[in-house]
Amino acid sequence: MEASAGLVAGSYRRNELVRIRHESDGGTKPLKNMNGQICQICGDDVGLAETGDVFVACNECAFPVCRPCYEYERKDGTQCCPQCKTRFRRHRGSPRVEGDEDEDDVDDIENEFNYAQGANKARHQRHGEEFSSSSRHESQPIPLLTHGHTVSGEIRTPDTQSVRTTSGPLGPSDRNAISSPYIDPRQPVPVRIVDPSKDLNSYGLGNVDWKERVEGWKLKQEKNMLQMTGKYHEGKGGEIEGTGSNGEELQMADDTRLPMSRVVPIPSSRLTPYRVVIILRLIILCFFLQYRTTHPVKNAYPLWLTSVICEIWFAFSWLLDQFPKWYPINRETYLDRLAIRYDRDGEPSQLVPVDVFVSTVDPLKEPPLVTANTVLSILSVDYPVDKVACYVSDDGSAMLTFESLSETAEFAKKWVPFCKKFNIEPRAPEFYFAQKIDYLKDKIQPSFVKERRAMKREYEEFKVRINALVAKAQKIPEEGWTMQDGTPWPGNNTRDHPGMIQVFLGHSGGLDTDGNELPRLIYVSREKRPGFQHHKKAGAMNALIRVSAVLTNGAYLLNVDCDHYFNNSKAIKEAMCFMMDPAIGKKCCYVQFPQRFDGIDLHDRYANRNIVFFDINMKGLDGIQGPVYVGTGCCFNRQALYGYDPVLTEEDLEPNIIVKSCCGSRKKGKSSKKYNYEKRRGINRSDSNAPLFNMEDIDEGFEGYDDERSILMSQRSVEKRFGQSPVFIAATFMEQGGIPPTTNPATLLKEAIHVISCGYEDKTEWGKEIGWIYGSVTEDILTGFKMHARGWISIYCNPPRPAFKGSAPINLSDRLNQVLRWALGSIEILLSRHCPIWYGYHGRLRLLERIAYINTIVYPITSIPLIAYCILPAFCLITDRFIIPEISNYASIWFILLFISIAVTGILELRWSGVSIEDWWRNEQFWVIGGTSAHLFAVFQGLLKVLAGIDTNFTVTSKATDEDGDFAELYIFKWTALLIPPTTVLLVNLIGIVAGVSYAVNSGYQSWGPLFGKLFFALWVIAHLYPFLKGLLGRQNRTPTIVIVWSVLLASIFSLLWVRINPFVDANPNANNFNGKGGVF
């Protein structure tokens, strides 16, 4: 689809397709005048025939083709004219090929069987073709979907190498065979479809295509020379020294065999003591719990029982959290090796195409300027422009988002060349110009200061235009929005509108100021109709998967939130170091990057950075089966999202040692399991040099398959799995990306609108086994879990320069609402069929990975014992009772050892992870704040939603900034019921401290000893809630009065009732009220 095609809107169900042009759209562009003297395949001169006239390859239409291209097409191509599809006739001097008719006027015995020159030339071409197309995927060639045609038209194949055949002298087929298997004799001879009215260079076919084959042949010859040199070094020939150019090439050949990444284990000097302390802590914890359960407090039995139940649950929760961190690792990548292998200077890039997804809903809560910065950082990434496509999903169908993207596309034509010329970081202009650093460091170009000043002025003008659009959007017209040409905006009704697609940049979408092409930028708003379930973000992401497969079909997908910009322009290459690695790429479902944030206060009061999770938990999971998917900053293997199983080796099929020890050996069933995986992945592991099917076969029942493949490839089963879109189904089998070569460009618009229609997913496996999985507001956990259950692994990539940065809700109310959403999703999964406690035991999910997922979904339940344990100190102080009886010196040892083991475990964890003690303490504090508020609400809301069907809506976290100060929003306390429970806990403990001290003062000196243990217990709770208390007292004029009123009222009523109705009052006045001293854990 051309970038100048305008906005395309339509509905498949209503059989509507409308094209809306902008005022800036011009008329029909004049076609390039072809004078017939230039070959339209390679770009060279056509040359002369033996008679001295201009060489004419096709006698029917005289389409300009030079003699070398004519010979190549006859020998190894389609043997047909690209324009009229007529079979080339043999000219005098050309060798005879199969199918030539006897023609008296051109037969010459001298050249009829002279294959030497022509075959040698064709062989050289095939050498280059085979090398260029299979150098990246030597272990598994690329499957051809049809007959290997190269198509022209509106959508160009992002990876032209991904659809070429590999037949030839060094390929898998016969020396003289034509690479077109599975040809139906009833069908016409396959041809290369070319539009004669357009310049072939615009389709990536002509000059570049021919030169790539020639350069590939040269590289193949150099590779053969290196192999011969290696034989001499092995003693099979004379002494040849690797000096000069040969030595450099030999070194390069060695570099191509080196891994592009490696695992960096944590030093044993740090990890071994950590593991020893964990085991000791487990032993101590067992003795501690044994003592607590066997020594009740008789005169405070309810308090003791409550505390013991809480402590047992805390111990269980600690085990779930601790053991997945048993084998943490680090990783490092080698971008130079990636460049040597796939992206050499002066050669066509062999990097695979990548589609980047950006999701947004409400432009008033997710400011268009933030989204624009994210898009600009994507368009200027350090990656081949023809291999990157950016898709922006507007799930709110807002015209403001559409207009801001239009402005962003125009500004990108200036911003992208500036970034690449001066190699600046980050490439989001808002954050680049806001940096308080020496921006002249490492800059040597004299024009940098002048151009930077001009670019900053351009960006400020761009911001003014965006702000004007935002101001205009504040007041919605009664008749709805209209576009520049007066056409009503199709998305005026956000709940009832057609699907919309607009290509802003890309092929034929305009060049940047330096005359270079830009990555494709595509706006997508899926169709929405009343009565259809849209599944929120998960549904929008699945729509992007389908529409991207139809238009560009990148082999890998990278999704980011609209507020997460590329902080590292090489982030995609960092992911490709794993995805394109021959050893692990075929079994890696995604590469997860950590989340890093801007705009957070120095002390990170509410633990927005999540440092402990990303630098400790995620590294621990990376050593097992990989990190969990966190919803953004993740690069996916498209095949994994399609529900396929990974390509497993013998080693992968061996049971995990922990599973083997816990569940017994599975060697008996290994062969059958392997066969099952071979069978299920057969479509991707078969001979990829043979086309999988003709496009016509999709509508004819997929005829012509062998028995094994027909199990998966029947028309009914494929449509039930992927939906009824032949173009999309064809794209799903292009394992290395790219558009199927026989796809008709004229059908792409219709298919793109079709696959984002509201009813496309009906009676398919979308959201169940394919794509983002439905069933929870935290679709990221379910999606990653399903992939891991199939046997895929994931990778945690933490480069020195953070790959992505985003904005976090520094306001406590918004932060708690965000945590509430995450916890609510966990409860939904816990009560669903996808619960990791019982789901996926027949898959390849490893035991520790399963434990990590169980911990991910059960952690909100910890809020119930946590809030009970936080109120216990107040009960003890008010009633003058305690949860621990008088203990002996022997029993006190277990209390002391437990506290020491907890402290040492934390210290050693910080030692190997590099996390600061302040970050660790902030994480502990917010664990209590979130546990006594958001997690508690999530448990009850989740039960209501799943069991009673009462849905609770969540709001998008606001990314807008406050202009009153850098962290002015930090002190805002918006009204939310989530603030009541922690405020009540604070007040109850403060009242308990006052009551306990008053009782000690009135009772004399002997009561101060037991008081210290209770005060320590209460102060420990208050210390964890200190950030919350500081926020309440920070700016009292901004604290909601209703929060204070409700909290004080609940705390006072509860305290007074407890004093009035004391369940621990003994009827015997001579009873001993002394409860002794002790710990509080």
Swiss-Prot record:
Residues 449-476 form a coiled coil. A zinc finger (RING-type) spans 39-85. Zn(2+) 2 binds at C58, C61, C81, C84. It is a multi-pass membrane protein. Changing G631S: In rsw1-2; abnormal embryos, very short and stout plants, reduced crystalline cellulose deposition in cell walls, and restricted intercellular spaces due to increased cell junction thickness. Mn(2+) binds at K537, D561. UDP-alpha-D-glucose binds at S359, K365, E366, D395, K536. It is an enzyme of class 2 (transferase). The modification N-acetylmethionine is found at M1. Its cofactor is Zn(2+); Mn(2+). The chain crosses the membrane at residues 271-291, 300-320, 857-877, 890-910, 926-946, 977-997, 1009-1029, 1039-1059. Pathway: Glycan metabolism; plant cellulose biosynthesis. This is Cellulose synthase A catalytic subunit 1 [UDP-forming]. It comes from Arabidopsis thaliana. The gene is CESA1.
